[in-house]
Amino acid sequence: MMIRNQLYRKCIIGGGRSILNGWVINGTVPNIGLRYLRSGIVTRSNEIKTLEDLSKLKNLDDVDPELIRKLINERTSELNIQNEMEMLKHIQNEERKTQDIPIKRFIRPTWMFLLMSSTFYLLGHYIWWKLEYDEVEKELDRQVTALEEELHNLIEEHRVHGENEAIKNKKHKHWYKFWS
């Protein structure tokens, strides 16, 4: 009796099924209609568990709208969860990519740094060697000039000393030894 009243209310309010449109007589639903509804709707609602089962039906008129809404909401929530999982995976992959910096990005700058630092080192080493060479050359030049002065002094001394001896020897030399 309760099912009859619910079906009657749905038909009167407009939320009923098209199957009942011709079966409501004086506010009651005949037993034949109830049997049909029970056999069709109840068994179909038991058979319909996914949207795929719903898509296999030829007509959606005899399917409870609450069941359709429930199936759509379930499928929507499943798809939302899948999308969120894919988005999380995508975000994690992007984080890994940003954290795992490839070595290829650093190869060229590393070579440039090595070449520039080697060039600066060689230039600095050359300048240092050149300054050291100039310093040693100046020191050796000073030694050469000191030795040259000493040599000139010795030569001068020897010449003066040699002239004195020659003068001494001339004085002691006899006049006749000139021709001999």
UniProtKB/Swiss-Prot annotation:
Residues 1-36 form a transit peptide. The keyword RNA-binding does not apply. Residues 129-163 form a coiled coil. Keywords: Chaperone, Coiled coil, Membrane, Mitochondrion, Mitochondrion inner membrane, Transit peptide, Transmembrane, Transmembrane helix. Residues 129-180 are mitochondrial intermembrane. Residues 37-105 are mitochondrial matrix. One of its GO terms (biological process) is mitochondrial proton-transporting ATP synthase complex assembly. The chain crosses the membrane at residues 106-128. It is found in: Mitochondrion inner membrane. It comes from the Eukaryota. It is a single-pass membrane protein. GO terms for cellular component: INA complex; mitochondrial inner membrane assembly complex. Component of the inner membrane assembly (INA) complex, composed of INA17 and INA22. Interacts with a subset of F(1)F(0)-ATP synthase subunits of the F(1)-domain and the peripheral stalk. Component of the INA complex (INAC) that promotes the biogenesis of mitochondrial F(1)F(0)-ATP synthase. INAC facilitates the assembly of the peripheral stalk and promotes the assembly of the catalytic F(1)-domain with the membrane-embedded F(0)-domain. Belongs to the INA17 family. This is Inner membrane assembly complex subunit 17.
